[in-house]
Structure formats: C-alpha cells, structure tokens
C-alpha cells in the first residue's frame, strides 16, 4: 500500500484557509449535553497544528443520521461550545453548510480563527458523494485535511468527492487519521506475539470477514457476545432461544476448522447469564453453555467464561478487542463486558480497542486511560482489519512514483 500524504508533508502558506473534515459524531443526552467528548478531543492536535502554521480553520462534521435537512437534535452547536472550552478560544458557528450564513462567515474568516459548519449531513448530497456539493465546499479553503477516520469507509462528499478539487500539495490526512491507520496496519502486519483477538457483538455476519482475515495472523481467538451462539450451535451445544444465525452455522464450522489447521486456539464461552426475556425485570440464571434451558437465552458471558478468558489473555503481548461480551446496555447483562474490559486494561499487552460499542464499554468500565489505543471508528476500524481499502484513505495516498 502506498504511503498516505500527511499533514506534515504539506507546506501551509500563512494566511490560508484549511478545510478539516472531523468526526464529531458524539453521544448526547436528551438535553443535548455531550456525554462523551473523546472524538472532539481527538481532533485537537490537528486543529492546533494548522493554527500554528498561521492559517484559519473551517471544520466540518456529521452527527447522527438526519433524514430531512435540519433537526435540532442533530445540530453541531453543542459541539462548538464544547470545542471552544477544550481549546480555550472562540469557535465561530455557521447555521448552515453551503448557505448564506456559512458563505458569509467563511469569507470574513481571519487568520487564526476557527469556524464550525453546521451538520454536513443536513445537505442531502453529502451521503451521495455529490460532486456539486464537494465543489462548493472546496471553494471555502486552499487546503483540505481529513481527520475523520470514523467515516473513511464511506464515499461521502466531504470525505471522497472533495479531494478531486485539491492536488497532492493541498490535501492530506490529519494526525488522528494517520494514527488510526498505523495502529491497524501494525496490528495486521507486525503484531508483537502472542497476539490475541477478542471478538464480540451480536452477529457473526458483521464480523465474518474480519474473523477470516484475522485467523492466519492471531495466536488465540476469543469469541463472545451474541455471535458466540452460532459457534456453540456449530459444535452441537443446545443454545435454547439464544441469538442464532442459522445460515452461518456452516461458516462458523469452517472458521473453527481453519483455526485447528492453523494452530490457532479458539475459545468460546463456557457459561452464560440466561433469561427468558430481555428486560430489566426478568429473572436470570447462571448456566453452563451445555445447559441453557429451552425457552431461555444467553445475554452475557458468565463468571467461569470471564475466568477462562482472563487466563487466555494472561500471556498476550498484543490484544485487539472489537465487540461487547453481552447486551451491555442493560446493567444486569453488562458484567461480562465490564470484567473483560478490566482484564484487557490490566494486561501488559499493547491493547487496541475497536470503536463503537466496545469503546463505550471501556469508557463505562473506567478503563479508557489504561488502553494503549481506542479507535474512533467502529465500521472503519473493522474494514481495515478485514483488509479492505477505505475510500476516504485511498484518495489521500501518494501517487506511485
């Protein structure tokens, strides 16, 4: 793979405007208070670096998936306020993306100032990789920097089409994007061994390609979460009413077989927290995976599985974790995921956490500071591990000389 153009490769001309695509897709409560500002904090090194070059910065991001233009719950105004506090300077906020307010504020932007555009997905063309929208955005700035790893797997207008309007000397990847790619590449190509992958989440279908790509590279593989039940079914266990992807039993069998051929040890849960219904009021039982009663379903890994997995991790030098061990959103089914987070955080390994739900588990467990690296992108992180080329990264590669 060619080398990516870094922000450090660009000779920024003082007084220029720089368009920075960020990922400020942050969770908020019902009062629009940001509950986790990790993604905002992650963008700060790139913003500061550009300001230090004597430029002004135009920030663009999405938040959620708005369907019909402006919706208050998807506004980036709370992000502007939080970012202002974090970098201790005024953030000018535009009430639109390519409307009069944005254009007026971009034109008036002075050296050293920072402007945040409203949610870029309020423009319908964004998710369609619309070239006309990309051209309008490109007219705002002399340089383009992508620091939004979390959307690099999507060919969207502000990530993909916009790069057509900047040559190699005027487009680059920001510090966060480069860091994300380096961690993923090293994980796949140069892991320090023993390398253990911990894969959870609800569905095998979402992780199938990642599992296939990881198998020849890992020493041990732990499979938990809802997806484990398809594997347990494949080895003949009675899984009751637990989540099952029947059409993938054969694929699960093939993965287990391939693991044996490659000498990779694959570990599945040995016990679960079972309930008859998924609700806070439902009675629970701790049962072995061989004894899940008919009509009951496994919703978290049990204490014996936690002990087993902790033992498996004890000699690891590299750990990659993607996907919770149970339905962690509900307290009574979150213990397995929380304990797994503690076990990974306490290890002496290089620990890389895939974004999305897994990052939320780590935050909730209070282990964020103990992990080596927490990815800001769930889907993008997974696609890199799957060996796929990300559209937003491909357009930032140096031309083959």
Curated annotation (Swiss-Prot):
Keywords: ATP-binding, Cytoplasm, Glycolysis, Kinase, Nucleotide-binding, Transferase. Pathway: Carbohydrate degradation; glycolysis; pyruvate from D-glyceraldehyde 3-phosphate: step 2/5. It is found in: Cytoplasm. Substrate binds at residues 23-25, 39, 62-65, 121, 154. Transmembrane segments: none annotated. InterPro entries: Phosphoglycerate_kinase, Phosphoglycerate_kinase_N, Phosphoglycerate_kinase_sf. It comes from the Bacteria. ATP binds at residues 207, 298, 329, 355-358. Its EC number is 2.7.2.3. GO terms for biological process: gluconeogenesis; glycolytic process. The keyword Nucleus does not apply. It holds the Pfam family PGK. GO terms for cellular component: cytosol. GO terms for molecular function: ADP binding; ATP binding; phosphoglycerate kinase activity. It catalyses: (2R)-3-phosphoglycerate + ATP = (2R)-3-phospho-glyceroyl phosphate + ADP. Belongs to the phosphoglycerate kinase family. Monomer. This is Phosphoglycerate kinase. It comes from Campylobacter fetus subsp. fetus (strain 82-40).
């Amino acid at each position: 793979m060619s080398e990516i153009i870094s922000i450090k490769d660009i000779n920024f001309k003082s007084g220029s405007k720089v368009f920075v695509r960020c990922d400020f897709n942050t969770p908020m409560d019902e009062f629009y208070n940001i509950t986790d500002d990790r993604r905002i904090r992650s963008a700060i090194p790139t913003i500061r670096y550009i300001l230090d070059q004597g430029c002004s910065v135009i920030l663009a991001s999405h938040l959620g998936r708005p369907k019909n233009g402006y919706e208050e719950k998807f506004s980036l105004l709370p992000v502007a306020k939080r970012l202002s506090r974090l970098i201790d300077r005024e953030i000018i906020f535009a009430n639109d993306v390519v409307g009069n307010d944005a254009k007026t504020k971009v034109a008036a932007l002075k050296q050293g100032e920072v402007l945040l555009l409203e949610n870029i997905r309020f423009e319908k063309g964004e998710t369609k990789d619309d070239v006309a929208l990309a051209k309008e955005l490109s007219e705002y700035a002399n340089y383009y920097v992508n620091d939004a790893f979390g959307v690099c797997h999507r060919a969207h207008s502000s990530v993909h089409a916009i790069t057509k309007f900047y040559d190699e000397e005027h487009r680059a990847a920001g510090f966060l994007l480069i860091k994300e790619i380096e961690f993923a590449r090293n994980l796949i190509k140069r892991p320090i061994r023993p390398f253990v992958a911990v894969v959870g989440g609800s569905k095998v279908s979402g992780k199938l390609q990642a599992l296939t790509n990881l198998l020849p590279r890992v020493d041990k593989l732990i499979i938990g979460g809802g997806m484990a039940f398809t594997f347990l079914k494949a080895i003949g266990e009675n899984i009751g009413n637990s989540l099952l992807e029947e059409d993938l039993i054969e694929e699960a069998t093939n993965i287990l077989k391939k693991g044996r051929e490659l000498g990779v040890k694959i570990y599945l849960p040995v016990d679960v927290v079972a309930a008859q219904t998924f609700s806070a009021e439902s009675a629970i039982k701790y049962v072995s995976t061989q004894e899940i009663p008919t009509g009951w379903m496994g919703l978290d890994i049990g204490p014996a599985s936690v002990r087993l997995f902790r033992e498996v991790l004890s000699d690891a030098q590299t750990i990659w974790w993607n996907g919770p061990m149970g339905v962690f959103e509900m307290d009574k089914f979150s213990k397995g995921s929380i304990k797994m987070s503690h076990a990974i955080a306490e290890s002496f390994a290089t620990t890389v956490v895939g974004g999305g739900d897994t990052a939320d588990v780590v935050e909730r467990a209070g282990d964020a500071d103990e992990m080596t690296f927490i990815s800001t992108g769930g889907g993008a992180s997974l696609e890199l591990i799957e060996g796929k080329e990300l559209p937003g990264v491909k357009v930032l590669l140096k031309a083959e000389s």
